[in-house]
Swiss-Prot record:
<keyword id="KW-0028">Amino-acid biosynthesis</keyword>
<comment type="pathway">
    <text>Amino-acid biosynthesis; L-tryptophan biosynthesis; L-tryptophan from chorismate: step 5/5.</text>
</comment>
<protein>
    <recommendedName>
        <fullName>Tryptophan synthase alpha chain</fullName>
        <ecNumber>4.2.1.20</ecNumber>
    </recommendedName>
</protein>
<keyword id="KW-0456">Lyase</keyword>
<dbReference type="InterPro" id="IPR013785">
    <property type="entry name" value="Aldolase_TIM"/>
</dbReference>
<dbReference type="GO" id="GO:0004834">
    <property type="term" value="F:tryptophan synthase activity"/>
</dbReference>
<dbReference type="GO" id="GO:0005829">
    <property type="term" value="C:cytosol"/>
</dbReference>
<keyword id="KW-0822">Tryptophan biosynthesis</keyword>
<feature type="active site" description="Proton acceptor">
    <location>
        <position position="60"/>
    </location>
</feature>
<comment type="subunit">
    <text>Tetramer of two alpha and two beta chains.</text>
</comment>
<dbReference type="InterPro" id="IPR018204">
    <property type="entry name" value="Trp_synthase_alpha_AS"/>
</dbReference>
<comment type="function">
    <text>The alpha subunit is responsible for the aldol cleavage of indoleglycerol phosphate to indole and glyceraldehyde 3-phosphate.</text>
</comment>
<dbReference type="InterPro" id="IPR002028">
    <property type="entry name" value="Trp_synthase_suA"/>
</dbReference>
<comment type="similarity">
    <text>Belongs to the TrpA family.</text>
</comment>
<feature type="active site" description="Proton acceptor">
    <location>
        <position position="49"/>
    </location>
</feature>
<dbReference type="Pfam" id="PF00290">
    <property type="entry name" value="Trp_syntA"/>
</dbReference>
<dbReference type="InterPro" id="IPR011060">
    <property type="entry name" value="RibuloseP-bd_barrel"/>
</dbReference>
Length: 268
């Protein structure tokens, strides 16, 4: 959790936002996936949001569903994902690493064992996409026992009650949805959410990162101008992977230039 606090303090001092890319671990295979993650960090990513392949990712649109399928096709298992996470942490000791999960994967070997394993490999946060705040007690309690930040989603139509719960239970950062629906660059993020960001700050929530439909530098700078601590982009990045499956070096070059441009926009 401290890695998030340190990151946001440093960015605050520099008056810039965070740019956080999302990819699925093991897409399109373990070796290339590790190269992709190194490239994202080298190009300026401030933190990572990583998915563990899951057969029924409800919150995700077709782009990220396909990433899951490619990782499955490569034979990637949750155990291998944890091995990858340990390697990433060893190589990049200070970057915050977040997991985006579904409850079934957390339940598999028991909730406590899951968070213990996260702590062991150096994960900083876990967002369980299909567990609403009001059902989150066993997850967030296990997370905090193991020094893992529980992350909560703040939808654009959140009422005051939900905002207070998200602020009270969340740690690390708050995942602020640009809009409802599923992930996807083809569904561009709506207008910046000034009012929600102000409310979250008023309730002392963890810093808000805006996600869903973030696919251009303009959207990153708009999120930061609206008061968000930064932006998360997933589908736009995964599309670059999908488009370049036959040319791994071209894939890395395009990822590098996309992330550099998105990061530059966070300084606007």
């Amino acid at each position: 959790m401290e890695r998030y606090e340190n990151l946001f303090a440093q960015l605050n001092d520099r008056r810039e936002g965070a740019f956080v890319p999302f990819v699925t671990l093991g897409d399109p295979g373990i070796e290339q996936s590790l190269k992709i993650i190194d490239t994202l960090i080298d190009a300026g990513a401030n933190a990572l949001e990583l998915g563990v392949p899951f057969s029924d990712p409800l919150a995700d649109g077709p782009t990220i569903q396909n990433a899951n399928l490619r990782a499955f096709a490569a034979g990637v298992t949750p155990a291998q994902c944890f091995e990858m996470l340990a390697l990433i942490r060893e190589k990049h000791p200070t970057i915050p690493i977040g997991l985006l999960m579904y409850a079934n994967l957390v339940f598999n070997n028991g909730i406590d064992a899951f968070y213990a394993r996260c702590e062991q490999v150096g994960v900083d946060s876990v967002l369980v996409a299909d567990v609403p705040v009001e059902e989150s007690a066993p997850f967030r309690q296990a997370a905090l026992r193991h020094n893992i930040a529980p992350i909560f989603i703040c939808p654009p139509n959140a009422d005051d009650d939900l905002l207070r719960q998200v602020a009270s239970y969340g740690r690390g950062y708050t995942y602020l949805l640009s809009r409802s629906g599923v992930t996807g660059a083809e569904n561009r993020g709506a207008l910046p959410l000034h009012h929600l960001i102000e409310k979250l700050k008023e309730y002392h929530a963890a810093p808000a990162l805006q996600g869903f439909g973030i696919s251009s530098p303009e959207q990153v700078s708009a999120a930061v101008r609206a008061g968000a601590a930064g932006a998360i982009s997933g589908s736009a990045i995964v599309k670059i992977i999908e488009k370049n499956l036959a040319s791994p070096e071209q894939m890395l070059a395009e990822l590098r230039s996309f992330v550099s441009a998105m990061k530059a926009a966070s300084r606007a």
